[in-house]
Design a protein with these regions (language model features):
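Alpha/beta enzyme core
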Residues: 19-27, 40-64, 74-171
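A short, histidine- and acid-enriched strand-loop-helix "catalytic/donor-clamping" loop
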Residues: 37
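Charged, compositionally biased N-terminal leader segments and the immediate start
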Residues: 1-30
Length: 171
């Protein structure tokens, strides 16, 4: 135990070189998604956010682009148009984000619409009602169906862990 405390103490006094800090920060930026999911989203807001994703720091060409922008399905084509040939992806929420409280058929239509609009990635929410009722098979089957609908598009599942209430629910 004493050895561990000494090692931790020595680590906390070490400084990280500026170059290493910048490298780490650039790596983090390159993995981030810029997201806007507000009722007041407009094409202008999407343009502003997308420009920031492409060039997070207009004064420094060494700062990489963000990984993606995430928008509602109805704004995917706008984001896609602005992205142009940059390497930034366009992600879209689907499955009636944020609640997910609709039949799977509606979720599939929502997902297909986002893909048809040009989404590179789909972000879904799980059926929390089914989860809280213990119907884990339904949750699983819906995720499988949505992944099949995505084809080769990347699928991410958003877990509202704050709503899962207990550590036992976070499995």
């Amino acid at each position: 135990e004493v050895g561990v405390k000494e090692r931790v103490s020595s680590l906390s006094t070490r400084s990280i070189k500026r170059e290493s800090k910048l490298q780490a920060l650039n790596y983090v930026v390159s993995m981030c998604d810029l997201t806007t999911l507000e009722g007041e989203d407009t094409e202008g807001k999407i343009h502003q956010m997308t420009a920031k994703a492409i060039r997070p720091d207009p004064t420094d060409d060494d700062v990489p682009s963000a990984a993606a922008v995430c928008v509602y399905p109805s704004l995917v084509s706008t984001a896609k148009e602005i992205i142009g040939t940059s390497n930034v992806k366009v992600a879209s929420v689907s499955s009636y984000f944020p609640s997910g409280q609709v039949p799977i058929e509606s979720k599939l239509l929502d997902t297909q619409y986002a893909i048809d609009e040009g989404a590179d990635e789909i972000d879904i929410v799980i059926n929390r009602k089914a989860f809280f009722e213990g119907d884990y098979r339904k949750v699983f089957d819906e995720i499988v169906a949505l992944k099949e609908a995505c084809g080769d598009k990347h699928l991410k599942t958003i877990l509202e862990v704050g709503e899962l209430r207990t550590y036992d629910n976070i499995k």
